[in-house]
Amino acid sequence: MVVLAAVAEFIPGLAKWRLLGQTPNGATAVLPRLAEHKPSVGESALTEESRGDSSNSRPETTRPASAAGVIAATQGAAVSADSVESKPPPVHLEYSQDRALAHFYQALKRTSHTEAAFTTRVVHFGDSLIASDYVSGTLRRLLQKQFGDAGHGFSLIANAWPSYFHEGVSRFATSGWLVSRVVGPYAQDGWYGLGGVSFRAPVNTLARVGTSTKGEFGRRVSRFELAYVAGPSGGAIRVRIDEKTVGELSTQRDEKAFKTARWQVVDGPHEIEFLTTRGTSRLFGVVMERDVPGVVLDAIGIQGARLRFLDQQDDAHYATQLKWRNPDLVIYEFGANESADGLAYSLKDFHDTMKAVVDQQKSAIPESSCLVIGAMDRATRKGDTVTSSSFIPLLVAEQRAVAQEVGCAFFDTYQAMGGRGSMPRWVRRGLGQADLTHPTAVGADIIGTWIYRALMERWQ
């Protein structure tokens, strides 16, 4: 069973399921390398069931883990997201244009005034952190606590990666899905849906998505929406809600087209199930929303992704996905994999491709606000010497420059952490993982809280 990496950080018996990090008793973990880009066209089969239910969920209030291991030889002062939630963030949002977040704040104003159950929507793109709902899960929870829970938003139909997980939603899918991703293997037509993953489902492939049974958020839903492709090679899907069959969805059509199907339910706890009964259907993901004022945050995490990989999508199809969700705020949080590339991919190319991706977004949904979250500090260890990467400040400078150029707000995570040398300190305090690249669940909670507080500074 796939278990959320964050849970494994707190339970020694689940150490093998950790996304990245330390093993018990101070041993150094065997860590997967940051994903390298190996382009190919085709599909890979998911051989494991997808599970993500309330029993796996991270607690809504997390506490620091112990800092065991050769790097974290001494335990630093305990820090939790609780201790920073009511304080100003260590850095403020940067703007090149005063109205960089005006549309987002206007949407929040309409939501806070309960205007006809107005929903403020956020799409949060990122790499492996967001794939496990790190940072994004905290930001969703805090925004919904302040402005209302309007539903979980988008999640993939199945787990495209073992570490894929979303807070506040229950999910299950059988094995057997055939998958193409923007990180490879590629789809021939460049159609990956909002989540950057295309799933083909042979007969008797099943997926279920439902409300959470634990915690304050994600407990109710008013409607489900399935994103799929209809076309000549489509099939049929039996749809059940709360274990009752509500009909059959045909995914056949003379010409290929992106489609969505909605099912309205009485606001409350519900579960929807999709079972392919004929032919092969191509699906992307499911949206859960409510007919109440509040915030919805779609966490679009792609393991191994660089921001430029979003441009692997067919341009017209990608624009259709953005227009479908029509977010009031688009967030980009990348940098870990780009930092692994170093200067093998030039800073000019990084700048140009990042700008091209954001320009695509602004062309498709010109009214939406955007926020770039800068890369974290990263370090390497040789023997007893730990050194922060000299490339990170260069990468952050390009992220800031693009944000200024295209009119996005910018949050400098690197400086918020403490700048050069901060990741080793984070590891000693239980906030950074042993790979010296990723935060722990608690560290991610703190970053998410900082971003929320930075957004609320201007709102207030």
Roles of regions detected by a PLM:
Residues 1-12:
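Hydrophobic membrane-insertion alpha-helices, especially the h-region
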Residues 10-80:
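Juxtamembrane proline-rich low-complexity "stalk" or linker regions positioned immediately after a signal peptide
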Residues 17, 315, 377-460:
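Catalytic His-Asp segment of secreted/periplasmic serine-dependent ester chemistry enzymes
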Residues 96-110, 310-324, 352-360, 394-396:
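Alpha-helical scaffolding within the catalytic cores
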Residues 125-128, 157, 299-303, 332-337, ...:
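Active-site-proximal beta-strand/loop segments in catalytic clefts of secreted hydrolases
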Residues 130-352, 438:
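Conserved SGNH/GDSL esterase-like catalytic core that processes O-acyl groups on lipids
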Residues 326-339, 348-355, 360-363, 371-410:
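Conserved N-terminal glycine/acidic-rich loop preference
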